[in-house]
């Protein structure tokens, strides 16, 4: 099945600047998102009798590896991501942690990947399912990869309005950067699953049953010393900074850093992540 333009855009993004930035910031991002990882591991651990779990949009594989550690010898935890740099990092980290026998990492678009039919007891995702150009097709493909009654469990962001920390940098720098990409409602991206009715419709149309969508508010932290790396490498601002002249780049970073002052408490940056915890059955 041919990819369309949106899929090509996502592949280019996550195999380019954004993907390499995530690899470079892997440690700080994994630490910041550790609470979500724990929630997903706990949800999947009791739903995977044979230890076969698929992690969608696995990035550098932290959740995949955590599942493998929790499920123990004999488990088979598979991470899939469209980003080649992230998958390479995931494989390297699995080797480093001696988890190669329990893990596998696939560089592919989960919307179109030919997974083993009914091959998984559980399917999970930490912020990895909001980027499909055709979410119904994607979740149908994932359902075909799930065994009967297998559990789907993923975490997605609520709205940008409810997550001011996540948009602080781009909002502050926007007056200096008129060409910076603007987030579009319901488009593939971080806040693509902000609307609960949309999530429910996608799950229903793709054949999943017993959907549950719960509000999830999680306190997250980041070391203040890592804040400049975070705001200058990630998100819409991080993707355009390298295109700017030195003066404009410096002004944009200064404006963005000032916007984070309300979140800085001594040596720590704190914010509340407003998310959805979503589950369903195949």
Residue ranges with predicted function:
Residues 71, 94, 173, 203, ...:
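Conserved hydrophobic residues forming the short capping helix/wall of the S-adenosyl-L-methionine
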Residues 111-122:
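A short acidic, Gly/Pro-enriched loop at the edge of an enzyme's catalytic core
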Residues 121-135, 158:
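A short SAM/SAH-binding and catalytic strip from SAM-dependent methyltransferases
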Residues 52-113, 137:
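Class I SAM-dependent methyltransferase SAM/SAH-binding core
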Residues 2-4, 9, 13, 18-21, ...:
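Conserved Class I S-adenosyl-L-methionine
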Residues 50, 73-74, 146-152:
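Short glycine-dipeptide loop
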Residues 31-51, 66:
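Conserved alpha-helix/loop element of class I SAM-dependent methyltransferases that forms part
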